[in-house]
Structure formats: structure tokens, C-alpha cells
Amino acid sequence: MQHLDEIIANATAEIEQAGSLVALDEVRVQYLGKKGHLTLQLQGLGKLDPSERREAGQLINKGKQAVQAMLTERKDALQTAELEAKLAAETIDVSLPGRRIENGGLHPVTRTVERIEQFFGELGFSTESGPEIEDAFHNFDALNIAEDHPARTDHDTFFFNPDLMLRTHTSGVQIRTMENGKPPFRFIAPGRVYRNDYDQTHTPMFHQVEGMLVDENVNFAQLKGILHDFLCNFFEEEVEVRFRPSFFPFTEPSAEVDVKRKDGKWLEVLGCGMVHPNVLRSVGIDPEKYSGFAFGMGVERLTMLRYGVNDLRAFFENDLRFLKQFK
């Protein structure tokens, strides 16, 4: 039987030399495992004289406890060193400049829609919405648009079938709102609309805001006053406005609204008019009792004028160099 003091001395040296938890566990197995040196010492007690067996057993157990205590102490030291090394590697140098956080910004078209909603909201107009896939009644028939009107052809409209299409304007929202309520009405309807056109000033999808007011004794002078105030508010300056006679199937009389630019030229910004009696009749409103006005504007066109953008398509190209200018 190997001398116990020698075994303890060797175990002590190997425990102190263990540089990792893995190496330390190997030492534990070597001395305390099923076939470890101290385990074999205990198994060899049966070969001793009974008079020596008790004392030898006590010495071996005492040595075993000493080795176990050294293993535990060394394990704690290695774990502490490992944690300190990990923390040191993850230390943040607070003197280094931080990562720059990019601030986002609203899209210019969104800014314009919100500006329009805010102005008309202060005048008591609610904001309504409706489906972008519309049927012929709400997109054409109820708006007094004749069967042979060019807008009903696939040159101008994206049809799914003869009765379903991508809406060409948000006027359908006006019809649905009036169908589901009773006058008086005062609301705007912003949203995406679709037309089969694509060039520098047109895209197949664009945004529109239409508005409507229906009540007793509504007149064109009220419409002119509201739109003049809106345009001055939108461009944040007093602008010269003119109303030109025009034709829209859903309004009578109808007008196009121009603003005078700084270079003296007139530029069309929206269309408007008094709601046609046939439109009121289509939703069960008596045109002898009620009258109303309606207006519609292209959001991208107003945005182009406000920010001096020349190509409408730039709003939809997702070029950050362009969009960052509007933060």
C-alpha cells in the first residue's frame, strides 16, 4: 500500500498545478474516483491486522477530507478567475464615443396628409376611410359618372372584373359615409388611389384627400372661403387663389383651384364644386332640403409644391438621401 503521506502530498501538488476546471476534475477522479488512489487505500484496509485497521481507516478518511477541501477551494478560485477574465473582456470603455442612433422621420407624403387632417379637424371635419378595392356603384354609378365615361375604361382604371376595381378616387368613401348616416356631414377621406398612368407627374398609386360638407343652406361662397384658408395655412403664407369653371360629373357647378406662384404663373392644386343632386339622391338624401360641397386634392402634388420636388416618383423610390431631407 502506497504511503498515505506521499499520496496526500502528490494530490496537493497536482491540485495547485491544475490550471482549469477540466484539469482539476481529472485530479479529483485520479484520487477520489472509483479507482482513485485514496479509494484503493480504503479498499485495502481489509488486508490489515484488525488492531491496525481502525487507526488506518481514520487516517485515510482524514486525508480524503483534506483532499476534498483542497479541491473545493481550488475550484472556487478557478471559477472566480474565469469570471473575472470574462468580465474584463466585456468591459465597456466609457471614454469611447457611443454608437450613433439614427433618428427616423415621417415621409413627406405622410407629413402632408397629417397637415391636411389637422387643418380640417380644427374645422370640425372627421376623417373617414373605406376599401381600396371598390365596386362600380360606389366608384362610378353613385357619383353620376356615365357608362361611356373614359374613366370606366381599362386605359385609366385597374379592373379585377367589370364590377370590381382598384378605386380611382376616395369619392367612394363619401358615398359609403352618407349611406351609413344622416345629414349633416362634414368629413375628409384620405387614402391611396390607383390609376393606369406613370410619368414624371403621375404614378399608378398615389394619395388623395377628398372632403365633403352636406347640410342645409350650404353654398359655394363657403367652399371658397374654406379652401382659401386651407391653402394659405398649408403654404404658410398669404397666397392668391383663383377658381376656374370646370366639369366633374359629381359636382355642379364645378371648379378647379389655382394658386399664383412667385414667378407669376398659375398652378392647379385641387378640384371642387357643389355636390350634384344626383349624388345626393343615390344615397337617399333630398337635394331640395340639403346641399353640399366637395373637394379633392392630390397629396403628392401638394407635397411637391410645398417642398420644391420636381419628380413625383422620388416619393416612392425609398432613396434615403432624398428622404433624410424631410426630417
Swiss-Prot record:
InterPro entries in the record:
aa-tRNA-synth_II, aa-tRNA-synth_II/BPL/LPL, Phe-tRNA-synth_IIc_asu, Phe-tRNA_ligase_II_N, Phe_tRNA_ligase_alpha1_bac, Phenylalanyl-tRNA_Synthase, tRNA-bd_arm
Q: Which domain of life is it from?
A: Bacteria
Does the record's keyword annotation contain GTP-binding? no
Predominant place of localization: cytoplasm
Question: What biological processes does GO assign it?
Answer: phenylalanyl-tRNA aminoacylation
Cofactor note text: Binds 2 magnesium ions per tetramer.
Q: Which Pfam families match?
A: Phe_tRNA-synt_N, tRNA-synt_2d
- Keyword Cytoplasm annotated: yes
Cite the entry's keywords alphabetically.
Aminoacyl-tRNA synthetase, ATP-binding, Cytoplasm, Ligase, Magnesium, Metal-binding, Nucleotide-binding, Protein biosynthesis
- GO CC, one annotated term: cytoplasm
| Record: residues binding Mg(2+) | E252
Essential cofactor(s): Mg(2+)
Recorded catalytic activity of this chain's protein: tRNA(Phe) + L-phenylalanine + ATP = L-phenylalanyl-tRNA(Phe) + AMP + diphosphate + H(+)
Q: Which HAMAP family match?
A: Phe_tRNA_synth_alpha1
Assembly and binders? Tetramer of two alpha and two beta subunits.
What family is reported? Belongs to the class-II aminoacyl-tRNA synthetase family. Phe-tRNA synthetase alpha subunit type 1 subfamily.
Q: What is this protein called?
A: Phenylalanine--tRNA ligase alpha subunit
